[in-house]
Amino acid sequence: MRIIFSLIFLTTPALAWEFTPTPICTLSHTEPTVDIAVTYDHATHLYAIAVTSPDGWPDAAAFSIRFDGAQPNTISTTRHSTEANTLIVTDVGFGNVLDGLEFNATATAFTQTAAVTVSLMGAAPEVQKFRACATAPVA
């Protein structure tokens, strides 16, 4: 019985939030219905969030992210683009996005006709590493 449970856990994809500092600061998370990547590039001084859904993203006038939990907030923009199944937003500041990811339980990315929700369980320590990377001096 233990072997069966071990095999199940080994073949189940990890749903953890992950931070990597190279080649650029990256915070990522994968669930069956969505992949999210938040990046910061010291060379361009731009933050980006890419939300990939297997169902794609229809053309929409606005894109929003709603954070539910201890510090609820909704952030909206009309400055987004889509490439294949990925919706992308770039900006010079992402404080509200990072706060939402760090201090809440779920995030729902949505347009007028499509939405995906992700768990933020375990995101906080990875967001803190991402923040440190984004503010670290570059030689």
Where are these regions (language model features)?
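N-terminal processing/targeting junctions
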Residues: P13-L15, N73
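Internal interaction segment
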Residues: G69-A139
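Generic detector of isolated residues embedded in canonical secondary-structure elements
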Residues: L15-A16, G100
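Short beta-strand/loop motifs in extracellular/secreted proteins, especially
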Residues: D59-F63, A105
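An ectodomain-focused feature that recognizes extracytoplasmic/extracellular
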Residues: A16-A60
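Sec-dependent N-terminal signal peptides
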Residues: I3-P13
